[in-house]
């Protein structure tokens, strides 16, 4: 694998052969999560396909020329021609493999797959998810001498790692960068001795057998499972959103705001995330138009007051997006006034969406008792409806979802499990 610059693009990528190019950024958790997958697959496919990386921030002109609008972005080339699908954002290992396989003959793909040998490992407790709840559970279990493995499709930290600042975590007088707070949580749990398997694809989850398969070949078994899978951003489901996701529409200000210096953006939403991230984006963008469906923000008072004082931010209350489209290098957002029913087109360089979250339960939706919103029901010890399975953090049914409440959930589950196992 090789790091290149735009001056080497022609000789390293376009000169011939099969190449996969990773555009990455700093302070980008999805980039950090895809890096070990990229490196691991380079060892597996490296004899047939060249793996190269390019730092997007220092090669902006080429990135824009190639249509790269989000980090990370993987592009695939065959004899100088871009082929396969472009991958962006939270990229799965299986998605990369699918595109790599499309570049090679079927027989060669079979030979490569034959090199992968299945493995099995066993633990006392398996934690699914490395956000604050999962990390806290891992720390308490480790300190109780319980053999624990922590699994996550991304790197540790959860949403905290992409939060610009955390101002209400006890013990810190000044606001803390989210990435630093999550890093410290992760390091504390790791140094205690908890085993980490992160930035992996979770291929299969069997709650009855207490068994999880990662990256299609590694089976991990445990006596107890803690579900700490958290939540994911809601999509609006309007025309053009899916097509422009990662190509002008972003759900991560920490990852992409830096690329909108002196540019105009649209921010969708009105809760804490939307208001706080809009303020962060204004450090880079020259103008922000916020679109919110209600007549007032639902964010906390301090965040609202700070936003209203920001001269870069214009607000459209009681409006909703109806479609997104690309016109040249611009994104056109059509919004509808919910009172007058008139529609307006907003032309910008990019769009950021923060309209709430949904629980990550797809792989065990039918196995556990859920509330009407799809969140997992638990008892006071964080036990779910299935014996031996616990749940903590934002994925569970509760009134408030904060870093501190996730930490409390993880603490309770870990103590309950440690007592039961011992």
Regions found by a protein language model. Give the residues of each.
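Beta1-alpha1 glycine-rich phosphate/pyrophosphate-binding loop at the start
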Residues: 120-192, 275-301, 308, 316, ...
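Non-catalytic, surface beta->alpha helical segment in thiol-disulfide oxidoreductase systems
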Residues: 76-108
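Thiol-based oxidoreductase modules, predominantly thioredoxin-like and allied folds used
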Residues: 3-4, 23, 35-42, 46-61
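Short active-site neighborhood of thiol/selenol oxidoreductases, capturing the structured segment around
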Residues: 14-26
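Glycine-rich dinucleotide-binding loop and its adjacent helix/turn
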Residues: 109-118, 122, 231-284, 377-379
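A Rossmann-like FAD-binding core segment of flavoenzymes
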Residues: 182, 186-214, 219-222, 282-380, ...
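Structural micro-motif
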Residues: 60, 66-75
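FAD-site-proximal beta/loop scaffold in flavoenzymes
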Residues: 237, 242-259, 353-405, 409-412, ...
